[in-house]
């Protein structure tokens, strides 16, 4: 093998961070040597394909990375190749070499056709005997890595791969770290929040014992199908793990040795946490059976993937949502700046490139995103969560939930357009959206649509008050209703109950002042590409304040053009007539919550429907009517359609 010169690879401003001379890259054409077959997943930095080595006929896994698109991840790619090339263990995925063709880097690895341990949990509950075998093999992999003074730092079921014959191997070394004689403990902030050790979250020095904590969380994940706190926002979990007692494995179906094993792994004091070698001697592990008992489980998972279309993956796959996956959150990996160690080139200082986005995924919102610790923004958010009170975790609730605080506060100051000390956000519908029956009704109520400056916009005051009191709103419902049917900025509910600001191309406003404010805000929040539906800001970066929705509600209830009532009047609860929300939507969501579709996103959807109905009474009825019209017409007669709508929107007598 020969090494390529640095000129053949993408250059960064800081050339010291690009020490590719320590990584062997072959100059041969990989498309000649390998036959690329179907895509089998998406890893840390690129797509993974099944392939054939034409020289030997061996089946391999091919990870293909576009280095031009993955510029921010080059050091992590470098780290993964470095660690893989140094490992030689039957419990760690094997690395066969790397090839560069143009800007595409081909990483050739061992193919494991059974998918991940996470895939095994998706096809059904795991028995304790299966879990014991998987944990034993992970422990053997960790024992090897720790003996080589390497920390994996991202142990979880998705990063444990299995072969079709029951072999279990540790994979995905994108955030692995090296312990040297001079650097015996790490101080960086990386890993997946749900599996992260308390000492790592607190940014204390840590060592290989952090992997043991992650193993304990993985044990609970294998038993329950999800890690502890999976119904909470990842940023809130970062606050809870150091503060709360360690999770415990609950359920009478689990044996006492299994529960004791988990308890030993989840000791909050790393000094009292056992090593991998010690845990291999534990009763629960010693009585584990042979790997062959996993074969039936692997075949069951393969049948499930064929039936549902869910692809296996070393991380969450973009396509898995469409195949019936039920993950409650995108379980992201936090990748942080590395502290440079000796001159062995393994651990390097990350460049100080600003990281404005919390989520690196494409605008389509594929899972498997990455929270970046490249700037102090995440640290500030985490510190705010530690200092703030923990409220309700429900989306859109009146209380100050930690996740809501994070979603609001994570929008950088530079991304907020201001005019006279206030921020203007204009609401509307996306381009080309059909005019609903609700919009037609509202446009009839307010035909003029002419209002003066402050009544045409939604102003968010920015001051030194708490976040929950920092918003005051002035809304012209007539302008809002007129603007809903124009091609402008819209608020939509995304998948998983998220709300997104979608930047439209048209102005949809009368008056230069409002147009200017709308343009300033659109430019401020546009972080992914130009206008249109492509320039979107995720719910986790911003959300619509509840107080603004309340003022919008009062604007509709108390007459168009009339000033909203005082805050004292806002506190008076308005009686709500039962309709489609209570008769159809909430019961349907409640039914789904008792099935395999029960997710945090479903709970958020329930809150969203309630918030929308509170803001605009009767809108759920309109929604049901609109849906029924689109589904039934012209196949169903109008009388039958009216009867069906009445059943869905009227309480039973």
Curated annotation (Swiss-Prot):
The UniProt record lists the keyword Transcription regulation: no
Cellular component aspect of the GO annotation: cytoplasm; cytoplasmic side of apical plasma membrane
SUPFAM superfamilies: Protein kinase-like (PK-like) (SSF56112)
EC number: 2.7.11.1
Pfam family of the protein (one): Pkinase
PROSITE patterns named among the record's database cross-references: PROTEIN_KINASE_ATP, PROTEIN_KINASE_DOM
Bias kind Basic and acidic residues: ranges: 345-362, 459-468
Homology family: Belongs to the protein kinase superfamily. STE Ser/Thr protein kinase family. STE20 subfamily.
Subunit record text: Interacts (via N-terminus) with mpk-1 (isoform a). Interacts with ccm-3.
UniProt-recorded name of the protein: Germinal center kinase 1
Species this chain originates from: Caenorhabditis elegans
Classification of source organism: Eukaryota, Metazoa, Ecdysozoa, Nematoda, Chromadorea
């Amino acid at each position: 093998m020969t090494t390529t010169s640095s000129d053949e690879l993408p250059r960064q401003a800081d050339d010291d961070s690009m020490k590719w001379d320590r990584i062997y890259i072959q100059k041969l054409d990989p498309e000649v040597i390998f036959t690329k077959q179907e895509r089998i997943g998406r890893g840390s930095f690129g797509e993974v394909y099944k392939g054939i080595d034409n020289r030997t006929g061996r089946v391999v896994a091919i990870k293909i990375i576009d280095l031009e698109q993955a510029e921010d991840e080059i050091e992590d790619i470098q780290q993964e190749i470095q660690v893989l090339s140094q490992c030689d263990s039957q419990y760690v995925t094997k690395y066969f070499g790397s090839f560069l063709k143009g800007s595409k880097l081909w990483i050739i690895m061992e193919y494991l056709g059974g998918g991940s341990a996470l895939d095994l949990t998706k096809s059904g509950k795991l028995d304790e005997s299966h879990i014991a075998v998987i944990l034993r093999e992970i422990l053997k992999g960790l024992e090897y890595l720790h003996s080589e003074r390497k920390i994996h730092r991202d142990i979880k079921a998705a990063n444990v791969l299995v072969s079709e014959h029951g072999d279990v191997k540790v994979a995905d070394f994108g955030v692995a770290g090296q312990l040297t004689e001079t650097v015996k403990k790490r101080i960086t902030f990386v890993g997946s929040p749900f599996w992260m050790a308390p000492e790592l979250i607190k940014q204390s020095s840590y060592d290989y014992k952090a992997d043991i904590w992650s193993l304990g969380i993985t044990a609970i994940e294998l038993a329950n199908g999800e890690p502890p706190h999976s119904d909470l926002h990842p940023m809130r979990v970062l606050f809870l793990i150091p503060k709360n007692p360690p999770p415990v494995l609950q359920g009478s179906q689990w044996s006492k040795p299994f529960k004791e094993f988990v308890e030993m792994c989840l000791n909050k004091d790393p000094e009292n946490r056992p090593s991998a070698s010690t845990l291999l001697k534990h009763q629960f592990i010693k009585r584990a059976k042979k790997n062959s008992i996993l074969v039936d489980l692997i075949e069951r998972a393969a049948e499930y993937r064929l039936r549902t279309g869910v692809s296996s993956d070393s991380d969450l796959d973009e396509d898995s949502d469409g195949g019936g996956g039920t993950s409650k959150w995108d379980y992201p990996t936090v990748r942080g700046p590395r502290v440079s160690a000796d001159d062995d080139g393994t651990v390097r200082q990350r460049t100080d490139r600003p990281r404005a986005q919390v989520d690196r995924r494409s605008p389509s919102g594929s899972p498997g995103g990455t929270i970046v610790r490249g700037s102090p923004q995440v640290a500030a958010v985490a510190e705010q969560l530690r200092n703030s009170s923990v409220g309700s975790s429900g989306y859109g609730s009146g209380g100050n939930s930690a996740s809501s605080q994070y979603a609001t506060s994570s929008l950088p100051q530079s991304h907020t357009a201001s005019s006279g000390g206030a921020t203007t956000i204009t609401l509307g519908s996306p381009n080309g959206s059909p005019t609903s029956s609700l919009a037609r009704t509202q446009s009839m109520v307010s035909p003029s649509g002419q209002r003066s400056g402050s009544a045409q916009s939604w102003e968010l005051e920015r001051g030194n008050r708490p976040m929950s009191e920092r918003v005051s709103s002035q809304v012209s419902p007539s302008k809002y209703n007129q603007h809903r049917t124009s091609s402008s900025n819209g608020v939509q509910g995304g998948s998983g109950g998220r709300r997104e600001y979608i930047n439209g191309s048209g102005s949809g406003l009368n008056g230069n002042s409002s147009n200017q404010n709308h343009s300033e805000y659109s430019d401020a929040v546009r972080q992914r590409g130009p206008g249109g539906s492509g320039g979107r800001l995720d719910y986790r970066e911003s959300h619509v304040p509840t107080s603004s929705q309340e003022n919008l509600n009062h604007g509709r209830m108390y007459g168009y053009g009339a000033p909203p009532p005082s805050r004292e009047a806002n506190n008076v609860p308005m009686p709500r007539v039962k309709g489609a929300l209570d008769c159809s939507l909430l019961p349907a969501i409640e039914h789904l919550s008792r099935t395999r579709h029960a997710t945090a996103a479903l709970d958020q959807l329930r809150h969203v429907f309630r918030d929308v109905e509170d803001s605009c009474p009767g809108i759920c009825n309109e929604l049901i009517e609109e849906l029924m019209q689109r589904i039934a017409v012209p196949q169903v007669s109008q009388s039958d359609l009216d009867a069906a709508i009445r059943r869905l929107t009227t309480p039973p007598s």
